[in-house]
Amino acid sequence: LGKYFRLNNLKVTGYYDVNENLAKEAATFTETTFIEDLETIVKISDTLFLTVPDDLITTVWNQMKDMSLEGKFICHCSGALSAGDAFPGIDKCGAFGYSVHPLFAVSDKYNSYKELSHAYFVIEGDEKHREEIAGIFNNLGNEVRYIAAKDKVKYHCAAAVCSNHVVALIQ
């Protein structure tokens, strides 16, 4: 997403990862900044995308939740996990949680961004600022759909099955 955002003139603050080499690699690839610690990237960003494996989203959230998050948008890209499940207690922090899932198979972190302009993005989360999150992708020319938290697992299952059938047909 970072490369896609940068190529479309959206500001990307930078990258943080517990593995500094991965964050430096992402920052170099996107021509942004390597951020040395989680607290700094949270402080200087208004919207944060936690692009970590699904089973680590809540772990990262738990490291962030006691920081100053008032008014910030916290997003993850899981197809199955709802924003509420990923970010328990986010409303108490004054922040807003979103699941922003591209209906798109990311097979190569260095090249998949080239096709993201054709992806649908499915958004679930706090209704208060949902239109602002959707606007990011609408302004890039992407189609956006909203989904209820209760439908996330069914949606993810359908997406995975369809994707696997297409791959099987191609092979």
What are these regions (language model features)?
Residues L22-A26, S112-Y155, C162-Q171:
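Internal alpha-helical scaffold of NAD(P)-dependent oxidoreductase catalytic cores
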Residues T13-D17, I74-C77, F121-E124:
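Short, hydrophobic beta-strand segments that form beta-sheet elements in well-ordered domains
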Residues T30-T33, D91-G94, E115-S117, S163-N164:
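Short, hinge-like loop/turn segments at secondary-structure boundaries
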